[in-house]
């Protein structure tokens, strides 16, 4: 979301280990206020039954919304004035490969770091904000 909406004004959230299957928190709720006024709310639950799993990102604006899956179907649904249209595209087979190659090249000393330290620190700050308040 940082790529789409820019700098963050505030981030907060809660996390908990509901399932108890492992030591890490398995549910996270995160909220972000971006500097441009965009509001974000995310929910990640890693212990739902397979038939209840949902991979959905919705971006809602004053004229409609855009819905898409992050890891699922390669399509975007645009809803405007109550009417929906779908844009389908070919699923990228190796979507992470270019970044992995750059990271390997960086560790081999062949290129500069593909991600700045400040970007990494910002992502870690958001993760900490999402998970610092415990729900249980």
Predicted features, each with a name:
Residues 1, 96-100, 120-123:
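A structural signal for well-ordered alpha-helical scaffolds and beta->alpha junctions
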Residues 2-73, 100-111:
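Contiguous beta-strand/loop segments that form the cofactor/metal-binding neighborhood of enzyme cores
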Residues 32-36, 78-83:
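Short acidic, glycine-rich loop/turn motifs
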Residues 35, 103-136:
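C-terminal helix-rich "cap/oligomerization" subdomain common to oxidoreductases
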Residues 42-44, 67-70, 79, 83-93:
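Short amphipathic beta-strand/extended segments with alternating polar/hydrophobic composition
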Residues 60-63, 88-89, 134-136:
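Juxtamembrane/interface motifs at transmembrane-helix termini
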Residues 89-101, 115:
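Active-site loop of classical SDR/Rossmann-like NAD(P)-dependent oxidoreductases
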């Amino acid at each position: 979301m940082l790529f789409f909406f820019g700098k963050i004004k505030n981030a907060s959230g809660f996390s908990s280990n509901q399932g108890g299957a492992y030591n890490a928190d398995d549910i996270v709720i995160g909220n972000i206020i971006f500097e441009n006024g965009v509001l974000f709310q995310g929910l990640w639950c890693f212990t739902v039954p397979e038939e209840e799993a949902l991979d959905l990102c919705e971006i809602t604006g004053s004229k409609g919304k855009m819905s898409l899956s992050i890891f699922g179907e390669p399509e975007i649904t645009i809803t405007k004035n109550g009417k929906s249209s779908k844009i389908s595209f070919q699923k990228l087979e190796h979507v992470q490969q270019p970044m992995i190659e750059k990271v390997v090249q960086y560790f081999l000393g062949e290129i500069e770091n593909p991600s700045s330290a400040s970007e990494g620190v910002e992502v870690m700050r958001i993760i900490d904000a999402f998970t610092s308040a415990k729900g249980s």
